[in-house]
Amino acid sequence: AQNALLKTIEEPPEYAVINTIMYGISQALAGLSGAAAAVLMYVFQSVFNFFVVSGSGQAAITMPIMAPLADLLGVSRQTSVLAFQLGDAFTNLIVPTSGCLIGSLAIAKIEWSNWIKFMWKFLGILMIGAVITILIAVAIGF
């Protein structure tokens, strides 16, 4: 049974659902430059981090789609991983679905709404820096 599972993972069926998903996404994003596609990957990962805070869980769900999508859109896989890492990183500072954040705020007796008021400018600076980093990565072929 284990060999059959490995064979299925290594050689997916010709008409796998993932192929349909990849085709649809790539057609929707076909006119974008590599830089714009990479930035959209970052934005998607940042938003997705709200729903799946776990970095490894997020990678397991999104990277099987993001890595081949990067290939189709002319973005290196390294840059797609960078977009994933940055998208997973900074939004952890504000997402209310993060147990670590909410637990830390509870111990410090800080309301989440007050935390957002305090953090939004800093998070904006971090996100602008992340976009610049991604654009540089695309420009140098990282």
Model-derived features: positions:
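Juxtamembrane and boundary regions of transmembrane helices in multi-pass small-molecule transporters
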Residues: 88-89, 93-142
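Extended, hydrophobic alpha-helical segments in both membrane/secreted and soluble proteins
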Residues: 66-69, 80, 104
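Hydrophobic faces of alpha-helical transmembrane segments in multi-pass integral membrane proteins
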Residues: 40, 44, 48, 62, ...
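Membrane-interfacial segments
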Residues: 5, 9, 33, 60, ...
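Structural signal for hydrophobic packing residues in well-ordered secondary-structure cores
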Residues: 5, 25, 29, 33, ...
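Alpha-helix N-cap/start motif
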Residues: 77-78, 112
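Hydrophobic alpha-helical transmembrane segments in multi-pass integral membrane proteins
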Residues: 1-7, 78-82, 130-139
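Hydrophobic alpha-helical transmembrane segments of multi-pass integral membrane proteins
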Residues: 3, 12-68, 72-73
